[in-house]
């Protein structure tokens, strides 16, 4: 395909360190990018870029399969998943595979199957990636026009966007079908401490589903992260899947409007920046979800949330001291507030002491003890079940506060287990990756806008120090 603009003008700041490492058609002379600039060399080689993306997908799926089998091989059924540093098996368990009442693992075979399926898929993707990177056509426009594209062809780009949206919508519906028809999913709120169940009564009311989007993101409200029943989660996926599929069909059938053609930058690097920006938002949302939400991420598999561990500690000591004869309704703490129970600013009865700041926690082991005005004193005296005591004692000693070089758990809890919670791993990694992707979004957006405006300068290549240095080889 003929290059429609000057490489010198657009691709200006790359220096070749070692000319012998480049392949024909992918060297600095023909692309303006050196080998270490990676896929930038393939901007105008749609066939080779396809190979790079398929191979990348193969690496991702290979990691999923290999890590899945690694976790299965190391899994000890007697210990909770969160004590074993697992991050993939909890996701499979949440989808209802291999678990029974209370989140107990009763069968690891589905986990093995998942790992093997991903390994086999990765082999297919790996072969396709190598084929398209080395053997397939360099460009797809001539032989396979449906799969070919020019980056500034606005109509083709929105068609590709539409196809992606439809695939995302189908992905959302996979979860819906699993929850409705294929065995159900794990519900941490099922009576008696959680169980796998089919979701029958979906929440489809737009006022409820979109009400989450209108909530404040701060404490007590918690935006979409505050979702706490599976009917809403699965109903939300019905809405999201439908919107994605309908939006995909819309983008395939229509051309961009004039305002969009004017407002957006239409180049490969611009699309990269848009994608990185979206992934950054996903990363930050996932961080908050796995840290605070114990419905989408059940504590049976991921360990308690921070607020949950704190409230569990207060509950455990209330149970202990009540057995020893304390009147938990009236006992006074060192500050003059209630030692075990007090009132929140809005009048609910809540746990006293330091855990008062987590008074809006909702957890399946605690909710049965609440009445219309918060914690119910008569229920606390008569209705506490052994499973609630066991679970809160377990969560009290497994706060998600450990770090790689510290002792895990709450500093004031002498029985804390020294471990790093999967919530810590997943929240931290997604926050850090979200931040890096945001920086990448800014970087590529800046470059794309500069190239579109035609004012980027780069460095004067004629008098660059590296030109007078001896080659690396």
Swiss-Prot record:
Residue intervals passing through the bilayer: 69-93, 134-155, 178-200, 255-275, 291-312, 447-471
Modified residues (Phosphothreonine): 15
Pfam families cross-referenced by the UniProt entry: PSII
Cofactor note: Binds multiple chlorophylls and provides some of the ligands for the Ca-4Mn-5O cluster of the oxygen-evolving complex. It may also provide a ligand for a Cl- that is required for oxygen evolution. PSII binds additional chlorophylls, carotenoids and specific lipids.
GO CC, any one term: photosystem II
GO biological process: photosynthetic electron transport in photosystem II
Topological category with respect to the lipid bilayer: Multi-pass membrane protein
N-acetylthreonine sites (modified residues): 15
Keyword set includes Plastid: yes
HAMAP family documented for this protein: PSII_PsbC_CP43
NCBIfam families: psbC
Protein name, as recorded: Photosystem II CP43 reaction center protein
Organism: Nicotiana tabacum (Common tobacco)
Organism taxonomic ancestry: Eukaryota, Viridiplantae, Streptophyta, Embryophyta, Tracheophyta
